[in-house]
Amino acid sequence: MRPLAIIGPTGSGKSQLALDVAERLAGEVPAEIVNADAMQLYRGMDIGTAKLSVAARRGIPHHQLDVLNVAETATVARYQQAAAADIEAIIARGHVPIVVGGSMLHVQSLLDNWSFPATDPAVRARWEECLAELGVGELHAELARRDPAAAATILPTDGRRIVRALEVIELTGQPFAASAPRIGAAQWGTAIIGLDCDTPILDDRLAVRTDSMFERGLVEEVRVLLRAGLRDGVTAARALGYAQVLAALDAGGGAELLDDAREQTYFGTRRYVRRQRSWFRRDHRVHWCDAGATGPSDRVAMVDEALRVWRHVT
């Protein structure tokens, strides 16, 4: 069975559409959902990632949720291997895999079957020492000197990816982007639906989403995760919302600090959405749908369009 991928920026309604499509397909063929949100891989990171509760999943099987402890590092290579195995197993059962998420590297590594450059522990350790000694800003500047294109696509605060880029450049003697495959035919013949809407509409959704997370207990969730090792996590501790709350708690956790964390989470999410849009819009395989209207008839029409693309994509 050809998979369907539903991608797009945070807050565009991907999870809702995936459930609606799976329910519509149920009378014809069962569907199973494969998560492609990097932070939903973590157990206990529920409120801040808008992870669907078991009750909200409508009885539809979900994969790649709650598979890591917060102290573990979520690598794209590990995700690709595990998620691809899930998809192969779903297809073997005669079911439809629905890939859902907005983590750019995770989505593309899966759909384009990336092969990852080898690693060298000694080379990586040396760059990690440089990171510790010089700081993330100076190391990003070093990356910019060696590979300006890579530096332009990696956040100056993302020490882990900066180290990885420098490692790959040193090992291969080529720019970091040279190790990434070009966009071609999607693996398994996957049909790709992209959801997006006008920026003012999405900004309003992100504001409501952020407020809801804090009101539903994001701060307490972070406190619980700290006891589970969140501070030791290379990737989990940097997640939007969690990083901001963690910094506020470290500074004393007063109401004003937490209000500032809420505001920083909102603006950080808006910046992340811009990156998601830039990344996904360059993929010519994506069939884009306007997710601005969310009434019952609009949801039905969106399911119709997703299934039309899934049935007829070439």
From Swiss-Prot:
Binding site for substrate: 10-15
Recorded catalytic activity of this chain's protein: adenosine(37) in tRNA + dimethylallyl diphosphate = N(6)-dimethylallyladenosine(37) in tRNA + diphosphate
One of the protein's GO biological processes: tRNA modification
Molecular functions (GO terms): ATP binding; tRNA dimethylallyltransferase activity
Entry's EC annotation: 2.5.1.75
Top EC class of this enzyme: transferase
Keywords: ATP-binding, Magnesium, Nucleotide-binding, Transferase, tRNA processing
A UniProt-annotated Pfam family: IPPT
InterPro entries associated with the record: Dimethylallyltransferase, IPT, P-loop_NTPase
Superkingdom per UniProt: Bacteria
UniProt cofactor(s): Mg(2+)
Protein residues bound to ATP: 8-15
Site (Interaction with substrate tRNA): 103, 124
Functional summary from the UniProt entry: Catalyzes the transfer of a dimethylallyl group onto the adenine at position 37 in tRNAs that read codons beginning with uridine, leading to the formation of N6-(dimethylallyl)adenosine (i(6)A).
Family under the similarity heading: Belongs to the IPP transferase family.
Quaternary structure annotation from Swiss-Prot or TrEMBL: Monomer.
Name of the protein in its database record: tRNA dimethylallyltransferase 1
Species of origin: Mycobacterium ulcerans (strain Agy99)
